[in-house]
Swiss-Prot record:
Official protein name in the record: Kit ligand
Organism ancestry: Eukaryota, Metazoa, Chordata, Craniata, Vertebrata
Pfam families: SCF
Entry's Gene Ontology BP terms: cell adhesion; ectopic germ cell programmed cell death; embryonic hemopoiesis; extrinsic apoptotic signaling pathway in absence of ligand; hematopoietic progenitor cell differentiation; male gonad development; mast cell apoptotic process; mast cell migration
The encoding gene: KITLG
Spans through the membrane: 216-238
One Gene Ontology term of the molecular function aspect: growth factor activity
Length: 274
């Protein structure tokens, strides 16, 4: 029985070792970026076109590889979005905007935490310090979207030999025209289709609970299947060994009966001799 239990435990540990790498290979920050980034289009449509958003921008971001500026930009985007969130917090008409910005802040904060928690070999410091500039909502969220896209490919985007050097021919005026590259396409969004989010705090709590539940499910399911497969192997091994165990028990019982018969016969002979 001890051998059977040892075999079952061994199967369980083997399955855990086999399945755990599958959970880890989903990416270091695989689920940091959620579908809430799709609401950027609504937010840009809601904000005045001449509204200005302050952002510390890395000079040469349009020409440098993404690994040269991604860590700095996610930090600066977090600061700017948090400031923007504070401006909408006390405006009842802007509850829908507040909810969208709040979700974007959470995404960017998670990306900042990821860049601080893991050492990416390809990520380098920006060649120049970020400069404070004012951007329209369309320009600002184009930078936001580009940073999100760059972060998704952060682990494979650049080689170690890539240089983070801004060309001397790049003028500040040319670099500041962010709207020239990658036009931001805005589908028509009717104001009546935007629903005021009067329960943003409840949604934040439910979203955080949902995210944690998904993470626990991702961890628990492989472990559960590992246990099931381990027990299945153990049961097959036990079933295979069961006939041998039954024969062993029967042999022991037969030997005990033979010994008892021999003892009785011996005592009977001794009694007859007396």
């Amino acid at each position: 029985m001890k051998k059977t239990q040892t075999w079952i435990i061994t199967c369980i540990y083997l399955q855990l070792l086999l399945f755990n790498p599958l959970v880890k290979t989903k990416g270091i920050c695989g689920k940091r970026v959620t579908d809430d980034v799709k609401d950027v289009t609504k937010l840009v449509a809601n904000l005045p076109k001449d509204y200005k958003i302050a952002l510390k921008y890395v000079p040469g971001m349009d020409v440098l590889p993404s690994h040269c500026w991604i860590s700095v930009m996610v930090e600066q985007l977090s600061v700017s979005l948090t400031d923007l969130l504070d401006k909408f917090s006390n405006i009842s008409e802007g509850l829908s905007n507040y909810s969208i910005i709040d979700k974007l802040v959470k995404i960017v904060d998670d990306l900042v935490e990821c860049t601080e928690g893991y050492s990416f070999e390809n990520v380098k410091k920006a060649p120049k310090s970020p400069e404070l500039r004012l951007f329209t909502p369309e320009e600002f969220f184009r930078i936001f979207n580009r940073s999100i896209d760059a972060f998704k490919d952060l682990e494979t985007v650049a080689s170690k030999s890539s240089e983070c050097v801004v060309s001397s021919t790049l003028s500040p005026d040319k670099d500041s025209r962010v709207s020239v590259t990658k036009p931001f396409m805005l589908p028509p969004v009717a104001a009546s289709s935007l629903r005021n989010d009067s329960s943003s705090s409840n949604r934040k709590a439910s979203n955080s609970i949902g995210d944690s539940n998904l993470q626990w499910a991702a961890m628990a399911l492989p472990a559960f299947f590992s246990l099931v497969i381990g027990f299945a192997f153990g049961a097959l091994y036990w079933k295979k060994k069961q006939p041998n165990l039954t024969r062993t028990v029967e042999n022991i019982q037969i030997n005990e009966e033979d010994n008892e018969i021999s003892m009785l016969q011996e005592k009977e002979r001794e009694f007859q001799e007396v």
